[in-house]
Amino acid sequence: MIDTTLPLTDIHRHLDGNIRPQTILELGRQYNISLPAQSLETLIPHVQVIANEPDLVSFLTKLDWGVKVLASLDACRRVAFENIEDAARHGLHYVELRFSPGYMAMAHQLPVAGVVEAVIDGVREGCRTFGVQAKLIGIMSRTFGEAACQQELEAFLAHRDQITALDLAGDELGFPGSLFLSHFNRARDAGWHITVHAGEAAGPESIWQAIRELGAERIGHGVKAIEDRALMDFLAEQQIGIESCLTSNIQTSSVAELAAHPLKTFLEHGIRASINTDDPGVQGVDIIHEYTVAAPAAGLSREQIRQAQINGLEMAFLSAEEKRALREKVAAK
């Protein structure tokens, strides 16, 4: 189902949601951190989704053990490097990794700006080693409130040339986008792209707000757009992309089952929607699974899957020249 003549991308992938269970175990031992289990087999149920979670917030707790072992900046550097290694192993040519430095720093009171620098270093080294192209998206974790998001924003701005876009993630229902207008004004002033998690837990109004008030060029998840025909028309007309994450939306109970996922309808409506993983380490899936298992189960035809793959590159926060070069590089192989 993957067209090997086209670039394979993953543009909605959380770096801090892709910490290997084996790495959690090793870092726990290295830093003498008490874990809920001492073997890989018994740890996995604590750090991966085994059964669908009742809601988004419950799903997000599965990420916590991964960041609890980030006891040093070296540990942050390691998981960033391993994220690129994982991307290469699964055949990705281009990946946009998003991360919340405040969340990564929290358990051990690491310097937030230091976490940003460590992630940049690890990703850069990974790209050099494995030949994957990557860009970084800074996440503000809305769950921790406006002041914490301000701290994350300042840390990103200290490395503004290494950050491609700003995102807002976390508890969408409890912390609406309207709380973060000034943060996104500064992000746009910095020349960054904007993508926002919206319409995953909250309704279509959250997506409208992300676009109109925060300046979103892409929407993370966006499943609730299916409830608003005018919104779907607007997304298609304005070419505002939807970063679909099929398996994730089932695991968070945002969508009841793959057969009911709106991605097929979005594509039929002319919306620029792509296939992505979200938190592959926590989900126990990879991009190959999303294309070859999840997408067909969601009712996508072979041609629709190919279109979603094309959309992944079209939606990417790359220049037209960078996209052309990547297409040519893959086609020449």
From Swiss-Prot:
Binds 1 zinc ion per subunit. Its cofactor is Zn(2+). Coiled coil: none annotated. This is Adenosine deaminase. InterPro entries: A/AMP_deam_AS (IPR006650), A_deaminase (IPR028893), A_deaminase_dom (IPR001365), Ado/ade_deaminase (IPR006330), Metal_Hydrolase (IPR032466). One of its GO terms (cellular component) is cytosol. It catalyses: adenosine + H2O + H(+) = inosine + NH4(+); 2'-deoxyadenosine + H2O + H(+) = 2'-deoxyinosine + NH4(+). It comes from Escherichia coli (strain SE11). The keyword Ligase does not apply. The gene is add. The record marks 221 as: Important for catalytic activity. Keywords: Hydrolase, Metal-binding, Nucleotide metabolism, Zinc. GO terms for biological process: adenosine catabolic process; hypoxanthine salvage; inosine biosynthetic process; nucleotide metabolic process; purine ribonucleoside monophosphate biosynthetic process. Zn(2+) binds at residues 12, 14, 197, 278. Substrate binds at residues 14, 16, 170, 279. GO terms for molecular function: 2'-deoxyadenosine deaminase activity; adenosine deaminase activity; zinc ion binding. SUPFAM superfamilies: Metallo-dependent hydrolases. Gene3D superfamilies: Metal-dependent hydrolases. Belongs to the metallo-dependent hydrolases superfamily. Adenosine and AMP deaminases family. Adenosine deaminase subfamily. Its EC number is 3.5.4.4. It is an enzyme of class 3 (hydrolase). The keyword Nuclease does not apply.
